[in-house]
Every structure is written in C-alpha cells, then in structure tokens.
C-alpha cells in the first residue's frame, strides 16, 4: 500500500454511478427478457475501462472499478457468489428489517416519505439454509480481469477492489441452518476469505466494507444495551481478522460508515465510543466517514487516539450524500488538521462512502460525482502545498503542468539574487 510520502494521495470508497448501458443489461437480466450475456460482458469491459480512465484524468491516485461488475448492491451481491443462502418470500411476522432503528422511531413521518420516494419495499428474505461456501471465483475473476485491462495505459498509483466484510454480507439475513448468528458469521468469514485472497493474489488492495459495524448500534440500542452492541461488534471483528488470515496487513483497507442513507442520523454511535473496536481490525488503512455534518467534528478524536503502527487513515473529506460540491479550501482544511495529528504521511484523502450503493441508485448526479472528485484532488494539492511547503510531487494532472510552467521562473529568480547582492556590495 502506497503512502503519502511527498504529497497527499487521493482515493474514494469504491462504488461509482453506473452508466445507463450497464443498467439496461441488468434490467433485462432481472426481468428475464432479452438478456444477452455476451453483450453484457463486452459492455462491462468497455465501461470499466472508461471509468478507470476517467478517474485517472480527474487525478485520483488509488482507483477502483466502480463496482460495475456487481449486479446487486454493495452487500447483497454476495448471494450470487456464495452457496448456502436462499431467497424466500418476505415473512411479515418477523418484521421488515429496513423499517427498524432508533432514527426511524424518532422521525417516522420523514422515513415514510423517504421510503415512498425511493420505492423501498422488502419482498424477500435471504435465509441461510445450507453450509455457506464460496462459489464466485469465475465472476470475481471477470471483474479482476476487466480491472487489470482497464489499468493498462493509464497512470495511477494503485488499484483496489471493495467487497463486503463478513458482518455486512447480506445484512438482516435470516438463518435456519446454523445454531446461532455467531456460527453463521464464522462460516461467512471463511467463505469470503476466498474472495479476499483472490483479489490480493491478483495484485490489488482489498477493501472490506463494514457499514454494519456502526449501523448495528442504531438497530440494536434500544432495547439492547450499549455493552450488548459492543459485544456484537467485537465478535464480528474477530471474524474479520480470521477471514483475512494469510493476507498481508498492508493489502487490507477497512471501511466503516454510518449507513449512508439520506436521513437525520441523530442516533448514530459516536466514533469515540467505537474507535477502539475499529482499530482492532487488522488493516493497513482505515477508511472512515468524516465529512458529513453529523460526524465532521469527530476529527478531534485523533488528538488522543493513535493509529496502529504502519497504518494509514483515509478520512472522508468529501461527502457522497449531497449535491453541494465542497470547496477545495475546505477539503484542504479537513486534510491538514488530521495530518497534523496523525502525520502527513499517514493520511490519504478519500470520500465518506460510495456514490452508488447499488446499480440503480445514486446519491448525487453523475456530473456532481466527478466535480466532487475534482475538488478532492485539488484540495489534496492545496494541502500538500501547505504540509510540504510546496505543491507536492503531483505526478499527474493539471497540478503537474502548472508546477512545471512555474519552475523556469523560479530558477531565473534564483539566478538573479546573487547579482543583486553583488551590486549592493559594490555600492557599499
């Protein structure tokens, strides 16, 4: 994993807005009408190449494939790659998992309106009915091969692929096979180890997306206690560490956010209450939501908390959930204040969460997505200038061209200084 050794590097959380061409194939596949697998595969390879090229053009350093290969959401995609789960008709007796939570209890009118607008409706449960085992090697290799091909001919620092952490695999899953949730989580972790290792073995960083680490608080407390919640998260993170056995620490990014949905989030657990649990996960980088108005103030926790030795902090300095584009100066401020606490070389600038948690959903307009990433890159350039006393070795992008144009003038000025000094001595 590269570090910000001479400038602030940039990245994002992974998912990017899918183009209509991919969505058309997915709609046909879901409906079972006129689906052409070969055409879909060709389209996917073409669009992954385009989105990687666009990230490079904007100036993002550590890029992803946009999660374009996932036909369902960031967490539900696993049902296409793991055996042992079954879709069953939704059982209203057990309650709709998407209508639970303290925030929803506090703002029922708001959430009723939001659900109606977003057409939120649960029609199936996902149930563990047999031994969980990984079967998605071919699908994953397709995504890996597309990403490798897309990276040829573009200049970026590194590539990563985001996947679901064990606790976030099919959230609110049901279980009729294993004795308890602990056994099911362990089985999922062992199955997902195959996916994690396959990504790293092909030369990429693996990012484990774990929204459930924080969201579980909103779902559990009340009626459960805070200690009950911490016990559950600790269990899940032990599963994460076992699921990444055999993978070098520096190849792992661990992402935690507070669920990403566009709600009040007044019942989110404060990071100060779980940062110790987050850092229990063995990872080379911790990718955290830190730019939204509910959590931005929490940068101050890093006054007292130390990163594990060798680890990197990837703070969200750009929000994914608003069409307001952050000013690069604000992005710079967010980066600099953290860099002064944890060390400039230990910060890579990122986004709060993905821009499209599933193929048919997007948090902002596509043009705004790219404008935000441009603001991220420019803010990182400004932060590099302040932290290193110069523009930083920007390497790519317009920042490099601008600095190249300025160099001759600086050298000329430097050559003139001795001459001026000599004139002063003669005058004396």
What are these regions (language model features)?
Residues 1-428:
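Domain-level signal for soluble alpha/beta catalytic cores
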């Amino acid at each position: 994993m590269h570090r910000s050794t001479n400038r602030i590097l940039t990245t994002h959380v992974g998912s990017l807005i899918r183009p209509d061409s991919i969505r058309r194939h997915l709609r046909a596949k879901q409906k079972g009408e006129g689906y052409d697998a070969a055409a879909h595969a060709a389209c996917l390879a073409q669009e992954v190449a385009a989105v990687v090229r666009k990230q490079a053009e904007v100036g993002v350093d550590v890029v992803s494939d946009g999660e374009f290969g996932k036909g369902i959401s960031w967490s539900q995609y696993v049902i296409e790659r793991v055996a042992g789960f079954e879709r069953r008709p939704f059982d209203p007796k057990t309650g709709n998992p998407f209508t639970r939570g303290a925030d929803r209890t506090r703002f029922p009118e708001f959430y009723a309106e939001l659900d109606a607008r977003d057409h939120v409706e649960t029609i199936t449960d996902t149930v563990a009915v047999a031994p969980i085992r990984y079967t998605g090697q071919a699908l994953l290799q397709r995504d890996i091969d597309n990403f490798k091909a897309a990276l040829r001919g573009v200049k970026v620092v590194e590539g990563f692929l985001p996947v679901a952490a064990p606790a976030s695999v099919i959230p609110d899953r049901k279980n009729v096979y294993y004795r308890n949730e602990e056994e099911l989580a362990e089985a999922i972790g062992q199955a997902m180890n195959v996916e994690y290792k396959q990504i790293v073995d092909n030369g990429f960083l693996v990012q484990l997306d774990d929204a459930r680490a924080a969201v579980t608080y909103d779902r559990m407390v009340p009626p459960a206690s805070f200690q009950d919640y911490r016990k559950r998260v600790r269990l899940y993170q032990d599963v994460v560490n076992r699921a990444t056995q055999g993978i070098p620490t520096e190849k792992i990014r661990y992402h935690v956010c507070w669920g990403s949905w566009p709600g009040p989030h007044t019942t989110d657990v404060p990071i100060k209450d779980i940062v110790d649990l987050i850092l229990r996960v063995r990872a080379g980088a911790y990718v955290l939501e830190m730019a939204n108005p509910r959590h931005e103030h929490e940068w101050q926790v890093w006054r007292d908390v130390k990163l594990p030795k060798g680890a990197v902090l990837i703070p969200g300095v750009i929000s994914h959930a608003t069409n307001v584009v952050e000013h690069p100066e604000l992005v710079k401020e967010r980066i600099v204040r953290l860099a002064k606490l944890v060390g400039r070389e230990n910060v890579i600038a990122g986004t709060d969460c993905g821009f499209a948690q599933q193929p048919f959903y997007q948090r902002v307009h596509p043009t705004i997505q790219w404008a935000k990433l441009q603001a991220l890159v420019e803010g990182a350039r400004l932060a590099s200038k302040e932290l290193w006393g110069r523009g930083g070795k920007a390497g790519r992008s317009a920042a490099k061209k601008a600095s190249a144009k300025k160099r001759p003038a600086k050298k000329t000025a430097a050559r003139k200084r001795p001459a001026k000094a000599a004139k002063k001595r003669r005058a004396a």
